[in-house]
Amino acid sequence: MHETSYKPIHRLSPDTAKKIAAGEVIERPASVVRELLENALDAGATKIHLEINAGGCALIRVSDNGHGMSPQDLLLCAEAHTTSKISSADDLLQLRTLGFRGEALASIAAVSRLHLTSTRSGPLAWHYQPKAAGTAAHVPPVPQGTEAGVLEPASLERGTVVRVEQLFENFPARKRFLGRQSAETTLCRSALIDVSLAHHPVEFRFTVDGTHKLTLLSQQTRKDRCLETQMLKGDPALFHTIEGGDCSFHFHLVLSEPAICRRERRGIFTFVNGRRIFDYGLVQALVLGSEGYFPNGTFPVACLFLTVNSERIDFNIHPAKKEVHLQDYAHIRHTLSRSVAHFYRQCTIAHYVRAEPAHAPATQGNAPTHSSPPCTGVREEPAAPCAHTPRYESLFPLPVQHAHLLPPSPPHISCEHARDCTHPAPAAEGDAPVHNHTHTGAFKVLGQVAGTFIAVERNNALYLIDQHAAHERIIFDTLQRNLGTAQILLIPYHIHPRSDEEARIMHRACTELSPAGFRFHEEPDGSWHVTAVPLHWRGSEEQLAHDILYSGKNAHDILRHVLATCACRSACKDGTILDDATLHSLVEQAFALPQSRCPHGRPIWIVIGRDELFKRIKRT
C-alpha cells in the first residue's frame, strides 16, 4: 500500500479559496458570458451588446440599458454572497430572477481583471475595479475608495458596462484546458443564442475582435426568434407553435412538421423559466409524443419553453443552473407527450386533407361547409389560467366535409390475407378496374406497380400506396385495439438472460408487456417462460427475445417497439402479388386509417394531383 507522509490540516488563503470556488461557476469564457447576460436581463435590459476578443480570454464586454447600480451597489456587487435578488433562504421558493446566489461577479473577479461602470440616471456614473485575486489592494484618493478595490467617477448615459480582462491569467490550471480561440468564440456565441431564445423581446448584438457578427432584433414571438437564430432551420411554414398547461405550469412549444427531422435529439432545445437546461426526461417526452411520425430513427426539431410556478421548482442544485427539480415532473412530461402526439395527428389529418384536389366534389352533400382561413402565422397570447387543453394556433384548417374520411374504428383485415395471396386468380380479358364507393369515398384501384405500390385513382388524383406500410399500419392498429386479449401457446417460448443487466431488462419488460397480452413466468434458474402472446401476434421465440433484450429500447418504449416489429414482420412484403379482392380491402382500410404513416414513421402513400400530372406531361 502506498504510504504518504503526514500533513497537518491548515486553512487555505482567501485568494486560493476564491479561485477554487470560482472554478465551480466559471468554467470557461462562455460561463462568464452567460452570467453577465443573465445579470443584464435581471436588470430589466431591453438592449444588450456582447463583445469578445481572443475567444473571450483577452476581453469580454457586456453593455446593457438596464436600471444600473448605485455607488453603494458597486462596492458590494463583487463580494461573495452579495445580491439584490433574495434576502433569505425562504426567497428561494419564490424566485423571479435568473440569478440569486450572489456568486457570479465575485467568481469572475477571482479569476480575471473586472471593471464595472454603471449609473442609475446618467450621464453621471461610477467606475469600479475590484481588487484582483493575488494582488495588493489599491486605495484611491476618493471617499468611496475601499480596500476591496477602486471606485471613481465616470460617464455613462444608461445601464451598466462590465469588462472582464485577462480571464484565467492568474489561474493557469484552468486556462490550460481551454480550447482554441475559434472554439471558445463559438461557445460564447452559443451562450448568447441560448439566452436570446428565452427572451425574444430583447435585442442582442454580438461583436468578435472588433467585427460585428450578429444582431438579433426584438421579436414578437418565440418562433420568430428561433428562426432568426437559425436554431430551427427550414421552411418557416413547417414550424408551428403549441401552447398548453394548467394552473401550475404553462408551455410554448415551437415544433416542426415531420418533413423536417434530425438524426439525433440535439435538435430539441429545452428552456425552463427563462434558462436553457439539459433534461433527458423533457426531451424524451417530446420524442415519445412524436413516435410513429418520424421514420428510420429520426427526431423532430423543437424548442420547448416551459414556465413553472416558482414554488414548484428548484434551480439550486447545479453550480451553473443547468439542471432543475420539478415538483410535478411526471404530470408535465405526460402533458407534453400527449400534446405533441395530438399535434402530429392533426398534422397528418391536415396533410391528408390538403392532398385532396380543391375541385373534388364532397360526398356529404347535406353537410355544412365551414372553411377555416389559411394559416397566416403564429400568434402568441398570454396563457389563460387553468387551461388544461393545449391550444394550436391556426395550424391546420380542416373543413367539415372531410370529417367522414376518418371513421373511429376501421374494419379488420386478416394478418394472413394479404401475405398469403401470392397466386391471384387470372383476370378475364378486358376486365376494367373495379370502382368502389364506401364510407372512405369513391376510389378506383388501377393495379400494382413493381410489386410494391398500389396505384389508385381518387378525387381526380393519383395515389401510390406502399402496400407493406399500409398493411403494417393496419396490423399495428389492430394489435393496439386488442391489447390484453391473449392466445395461449401450446409450446411456451423460453428466454434465457445471459447477464444481470439482461435479467433486469426482462423484469421491466414483463411489467410493460403484460397489459398487451403477454404472460411471463420466471423459473428458479433465472430463465423465463412466455406462456401467452397477444391475439394477433405473428412473431417467433427468437424474435421476441431479440426485441426485448437487444433492441436497446427502454421500458416505456418496449411495448410499442414489440408491436411495431410484429406488425412489420406480419405485413405483406415487397414483391407480393395481391388479388383484386385483397387490393380493394387493403386500399379501403388504408384510406380509413387515423393517420397515413406506418408505425416507424414512413408515409403510407404519396399523392400526385391532376394539376401536377398535367404539368409533368406539359399539358395545359
Curated annotation (Swiss-Prot):
Keyword DNA damage in annotation: yes
Ranges annotated as biased composition (Polar residues): 363-374
Coiled coil recorded as keyword: no
GO MF annotations, alphabetized: ATP binding; ATP hydrolysis activity; ATP-dependent DNA damage sensor activity; mismatched DNA binding
CC per GO annotation: mismatch repair complex
Pfam families noted in UniProt: DNA_mis_repair (PF01119), HATPase_c_3 (PF13589), MutL_C (PF08676)
Stretches for region Disordered: 360-382
Keyword annotations: DNA damage, DNA repair
GO biological process assignments: mismatch repair
Superkingdom assignment: Bacteria
Gene3D superfamilies for the chain: 3.30.230.10, Histidine kinase-like ATPase, C-terminal domain (3.30.565.10), MutL, C-terminal domain, dimerisation subdomain (3.30.1540.20), MutL, C-terminal domain, regulatory subdomain (3.30.1370.100)
Described purpose of this protein according to its UniProt entry: This protein is involved in the repair of mismatches in DNA. It is required for dam-dependent methyl-directed DNA mismatch repair. May act as a 'molecular matchmaker', a protein that promotes the formation of a stable complex between two or more DNA-binding proteins in an ATP-dependent manner without itself being part of a final effector complex.
Family note: Belongs to the DNA mismatch repair MutL/HexB family.
Name recorded for this polypeptide: DNA mismatch repair protein MutL
Species this protein is from: Treponema pallidum (strain Nichols)
Recorded name of the encoding gene: mutL
